[in-house]
Amino acid sequence: MNSNRSLLVMGLLLVSFLIFTQWQQDFNPEIQAQKQAQQQSRDVPHATNTANAITEHMTKGKTITVESDVLRLVIDTLGGDVIESDLLAHKASLDSTDPLKLLTTEGLIYTAQSGLVGKNGIDTHIGRAPYQVTQDHFTLAKGQNEIVVPMTFEQDGVMYTKTFTLKRGSYDVAVSFDIQNNSANTIEVQPYGQIKHSLLDSSGNLAMPTYTGGAYSSSETNYKKYSFDEMTKANLNIDTKGGWVALLQHYFVSAWVPNQDASNTLYSRTHNGVATIGYRGPITTVKPNTKTTITSQLWTGPKDQKEMAQAATHLELTVDYGWAWFIAKPLFWLLIFIHSIIGNWGLAIMGVTLVVKSLLYPLTKAQYTSMAKMRMLQPKLQELRERYGDDRQQMSQEMMKLYKQEKVNPMGGCLPLILQMPIFIALYWTFMEAVELRHAPFFGWIQDLSAQDPYYIFPVLMGLSMFLLQKMSPTAVADPTQLKVMTFMPVIFTVFFLWFPSGLVLYWLTSNCITIVQQWLIYRNLEKKGLHTRKK
C-alpha cells in the first residue's frame, strides 16, 4: 500500500464513519417493547389535548424569577414548575446579546415539572398546588454563595414548602419538599419529577450528527439514550435505586436527579406531540405532628463534565463519545490542560494534534517504511506473477517466501493506518461534543470553532495540504480508476469539509501539515538507506 492509497483508504473510512453515524441517527433499530406501569398515567400529571393547552395550563399561574450569576429560572407558582431557564454565561447565538434559553415555552414545550402525587397528593389531573411566595424576583446578591426560594401551600392542616436553592456558579438546582403535617391524619404522598419536550427530529446532519432526545441512568445501566422514537414505540418503565432521567441536545442537558438512596421508577410517555421522561419516588408517609423532607436535584445547563460528575453519578456520560470514549476522554482532558496553559481553544486543538501525531510517529514511520520496502519488491513480485500467473496457489506461496526472506510484512503499510482510525474518531467526537468550543474564537475571521468557516478558507487550505501530500508521496497505482479517485480526493474532501465545524477542519489541516513534515523526515531517512527515490 503506497501513501496515495493510504489517503484514499483514510478518506473512505472517514466518509463511511460519518455515513454510519448519520444512519444511526435516522434508522435506529426498533427496540423491544417494555412492560408499562399500570398506574403511571393515573398518578402523574400528563399532557393535555394540545400543545397550546399545555402552555396555557402551565403559565396561567403567577410566575416568579430566580437569578444567580449563571442561571435565571422562571417558575410558575401553580405547581412550582420551571418553565424557563436562561444560561447567562452562554449566548443564544454568536451575534446575540441574549442568553441561551434552554427550558422554554416559546415556540415549543420544554419544561421541568415536579410535585407530589399519590393518595394525598396535591398535584393531580384536576389541578396543581397554588403556591404562595413573598416576592416576584429573587437575585443572588454579592457575597452570597446561594439563594433559597421557598414556596408554600397549606391544605387540610398540612403545610407544604417547595424550595429551590441555586448556588453561585452552578447549574445544579436543589429542589426539596418540606411537609409539616399539623393534622390528625396520616398522609401519603409520592414525589415525581419529569421533563416535557415537544417531539422533534434530531437537528443533526452528515457533517455534525447530534442527538436530541431522552436518556437515563439506573443501577443496571450507567447511561443509555432513549430517543423520542423509542418513547413513541414503548414507554420506559424501570425500577432502580437512585438513577436519573435527562433530556439531551447538542452541548446542553436538563436532568432530574431523585434521592439516590431511594427506590425510584423511571418512566416515559408521549401524548399529543409532547414527550415526557421522568421519575417517581417511593411513597412517603407523614404521621400527624411530624415533618418530612423529600429532596431532588434539577440540572439545567451545559454539558460540563466536571460539574455534572459532581452533581450526579454518571451524569457526565451525557457527553457521549460513543465506543471510542476510552480514547476520547483522555484527549478531552488533554485539550483542557493545554487550553489552561495557552488560553486559546484553537491553539489548544493544534496542541492536541501535535501531541497525538508525535505519539503516533512510530506507527507512521513503520507504515512508510513498510510501504517503501513493498515498492522495492515490486520488480521481484512482478517476476513471480509472470512466472506463476496460471498457478495462483504456487504464486502465493512464493510471494510469502519472498516476504519472509526480505523481512517485509505485506500488511505493514495498512495496519498502522487502521490503528490510527480509532484515535481520529475519538478526536472527532471530542471536538464535536466539547461545549467549551461553542462560540470559542480562534483568530481573525474564526470567531466560533463549533461553526463552519464563514469564508471556507480552512477547508481550501486543508484541500491544498492534501494535494501537497499526494505530490510528495510515491505512487505505484496502475489502475486508472484508482488514479482518478485519488486525484480528485483533495477536491472531494474540500467540498465535504465546507460544512464541518472550523475546529474540526483546523485539526485536520494541522494534522496534514504535521504529516507533511514527518513524511519529509521519514523519506529523507529512507533515501539514506536506499529505500526511497525522491519524486521529480
Curated annotation (Swiss-Prot):
Belongs to the OXA1/ALB3/YidC family. Type 1 subfamily. GO terms for biological process: protein insertion into membrane; protein transport. This is Membrane protein insertase YidC. Gene3D superfamilies: 2.70.98.90. HAMAP family: YidC_type1. The keyword Cell membrane applies. GO terms for molecular function: membrane insertase activity. It holds the Pfam family 60KD_IMP. The gene is yidC. Interacts with the Sec translocase complex via SecD. Specifically interacts with transmembrane segments of nascent integral membrane proteins during membrane integration. Keywords: Cell inner membrane, Cell membrane, Chaperone, Membrane, Protein transport, Transmembrane, Transmembrane helix, Transport. InterPro entries: Membr_insert_YidC, Membr_insert_YidC_N, YidC/ALB3/OXA1/COX18, YidC/Oxa/ALB_C, YidC_ALB_C, YidC_periplasmic_sf. GO terms for cellular component: plasma membrane. It is a multi-pass membrane protein. The keyword Membrane applies.
